[in-house]
């Protein structure tokens, strides 16, 4: 119960049509060492003030990553306490041991370092047909409280509310790409309380501090 109380819930991204990555770009300082796991910030690199950006992935995609590394395995000593900011967008659902992955991410963060991420909750299956990576897990707000229990602070940002979440599943891919851009999801979810929207959502952005 104390872990759940420790978690701050912020409904900003249910009520505003804004990319969470904008917040990440704004938070990164010019002298920060940054690790992007899965390269979820790839199209934002030119907007990031710091140029000390390292990319990591379990697969080799040719032009990235800088380091091929399974985050469920022990990190190289050169990566320990190296990074001020770590970004992990839509990755933890694809690893076979998210608890071990988070433990290793914490080891790579400097003291007071910050982890930014996203995980799905009520969301459709989305492993590629090639099975280059798999789709293992979904995370409720309570799961995130426990997953990040060893961090100083946890703030989670629900994505989509109780009404727009099933529509996103029903119109998989098309909802986000076309319909959601009109802002109709914000209008629909206004008919539901903040609490219900935060509990019956598509997924969560999160910011946790070591």
Language-model region placement:
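Surface-exposed loop/turn positions
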Residues: 32, 112-113
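S-adenosyl-L-methionine-dependent methyltransferase catalytic module, highlighting the catalytic core
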Residues: 96-100, 104, 114-209
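Conserved N-terminal segment of class I S-adenosyl-L-methionine
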Residues: 1-81, 85, 201-204
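Conserved short-loop catalytic and cofactor-binding motifs
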Residues: 74, 89, 131-132
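A short beta-strand submotif of the Rossmann-like class I SAM-dependent methyltransferase core
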Residues: 85-91
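Redox-cofactor binding/interface segments in oxidoreductases and associated redox assembly factors
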Residues: 36, 88, 117
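Short, solvent-exposed loop/turn segments at secondary-structure junctions
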Residues: 40-44, 59-61, 72, 93, ...
């Amino acid at each position: 119960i104390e872990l759940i109380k420790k978690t701050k819930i912020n409904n900003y991204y249910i009520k505003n049509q804004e990319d969470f990555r904008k917040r990440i770009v704004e938070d990164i300082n010019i002298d920060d060492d940054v690790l992007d796991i899965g390269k979820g910030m790839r199209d934002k690199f030119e907007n990031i003030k710091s140029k000390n950006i390292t990319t990591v992935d379990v697969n080799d995609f040719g032009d990235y990553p800088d380091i091929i590394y399974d985050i469920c395995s022990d990190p190289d000593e050169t990566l320990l306490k190296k990074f001020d900011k770590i970004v992990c967008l839509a990755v933890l659902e694809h690893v076979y041991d998210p608890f071990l992955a988070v433990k290793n991410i914490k080891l790579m963060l400097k003291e007071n370092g910050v982890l930014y991420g996203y995980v799905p909750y009520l969301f459709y299956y989305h492993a590629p047909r090639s099975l280059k990576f798999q789709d293992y897990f979904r995370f409720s707000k309570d799961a995130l409280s426990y997953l990040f229990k060893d961090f100083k602070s946890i703030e989670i940002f629900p994505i989509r509310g109780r009404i727009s979440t099933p529509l996103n599943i029903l119109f998989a891919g098309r909802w986000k790409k076309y319909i959601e851009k009109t802002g109709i999801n914000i209008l629909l979810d206004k008919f539901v309380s903040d609490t219900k929207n935060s509990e019956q959502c598509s997924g969560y952005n999160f910011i946790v501090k070591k």
